[in-house]
């Protein structure tokens, strides 16, 4: 039973075809397209794929993108199904004031991270960091309850904001330094340490709240940039959203008639 997982972010659509809708399924194919190029999927990379039995995705870019993806999926006559955050799913409890207003990507990544943690050993508090166009830092207790999270700009947004709002500053490529001694390095280091500082602060909050050292998982296209600057042990995971979609799909599609 092949399964298509789709993660639509702020700038790109990422997809992966698995040989089953369950955790640990084998990866058959994967790819990514910028949102402006979604219409290429059916006649391009998807044209050579076997028809998936089911599809499940998460999207932060709005209903218009959902419609565009659904049009591409007419290639297979497979309905497009999307995750909507709820009060509880796959063993994770949603502590947001209004659960359905939580970003679907955040919700799915937390589910993926929680089950990845449980597969490694006993339950413990967990910090989940996604580093992309925006950065999110989530806190879950040992029972799988989402307590709350932070949202802050990613590297690119920070640098563009400084460029547009500050006279004479342009956005060159710099390095992360302990003591930056030029503008390029100062900009890059400032953004990196801002993100690392947010993670550290949430780590301290969660440790104090739970009385236990949290685990930390990081994902997202720019996660590798943060690795050398992190002060706590962490696991860098290629795509927690796909992990979460597999967990959710295993439960949802098992309930559907064959």
Curated annotation (Swiss-Prot):
It catalyses: (R)-pantothenate + ATP = (R)-4'-phosphopantothenate + ADP + H(+). It is an enzyme of class 2 (transferase). Gene3D superfamilies: 3.30.420.40. GO terms for biological process: coenzyme A biosynthetic process. Homodimer. Its cofactor is NH4(+); K(+). Its main location: cytoplasm. This is Type III pantothenate kinase. A monovalent cation. Ammonium or potassium. It is found in: Cytoplasm. ATP binds at residues 7-14, 133. Pfam families: Pan_kinase (PF03309). Substrate binds at residues 96, 103-106, 183. The gene is coaX. Coiled coil: none annotated. The keyword Hydrolase does not apply. CDD domains: ASKHA_NBD_PanK-III. One of its GO terms (molecular function) is ATP binding. One of its GO terms (cellular component) is cytoplasm. Keywords: ATP-binding, Coenzyme A biosynthesis, Cytoplasm, Kinase, Nucleotide-binding, Potassium, Transferase. Its EC number is 2.7.1.33. Pathway: Cofactor biosynthesis; coenzyme A biosynthesis; CoA from (R)-pantothenate: step 1/5. Catalyzes the phosphorylation of pantothenate (Pan), the first step in CoA biosynthesis. The lineage of its organism: Bacteria, Pseudomonadati, Pseudomonadota, Betaproteobacteria, Burkholderiales.
């Amino acid at each position: 039973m092949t399964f298509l997982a789709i993660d639509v972010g702020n700038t790109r659509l990422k997809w992966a075809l698995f040989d089953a809708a369950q955790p640990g399924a084998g990866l058959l194919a994967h790819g990514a397209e910028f949102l402006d190029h979604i219409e290429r999927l059916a006649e391009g990379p998807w044209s050579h794929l076997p028809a998936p039995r089911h599809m499940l995705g998460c999207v932060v870019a709005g209903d218009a993108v959902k419609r565009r993806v659904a049009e591409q999926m007419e290639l297979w006559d497979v309905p497009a199904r999307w995750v909507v955050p709820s009060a509880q799913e796959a063993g994770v409890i949603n502590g947001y004031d209004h659960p359905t207003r939580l970003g679907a990507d955040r919700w799915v990544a937390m589910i993926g991270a929680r089950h990845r943690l449980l597969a490694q050993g006993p339950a413990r508090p967990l910090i989940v960091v996604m580093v992309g166009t925006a950065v999110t830092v989530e806190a879950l207790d040992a029972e799988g309850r989402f307590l709350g999270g932070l949202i802050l700009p990613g590297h690119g947004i920070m640098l563009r904001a400084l460029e547009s709002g500050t006279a004479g500053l342009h956005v060159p490529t710099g390095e992360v330094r302990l003591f930056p001694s030029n503008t390029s390095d100062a900009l890059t280091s400032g953004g990196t340490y801002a993100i690392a500082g947010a993670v550290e602060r949430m780590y301290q909050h969660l440790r104090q709240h739970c009385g236990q050292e949290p685990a930390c998982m990081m994902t997202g296209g720019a996660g590798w940039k943060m690795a050398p600057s992190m002060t706590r042990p962490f696991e860098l995971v290629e795509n927690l959203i796909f992990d979460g979609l597999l967990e959710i799909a295993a439960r949802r599609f098992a309930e559907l008639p064959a």
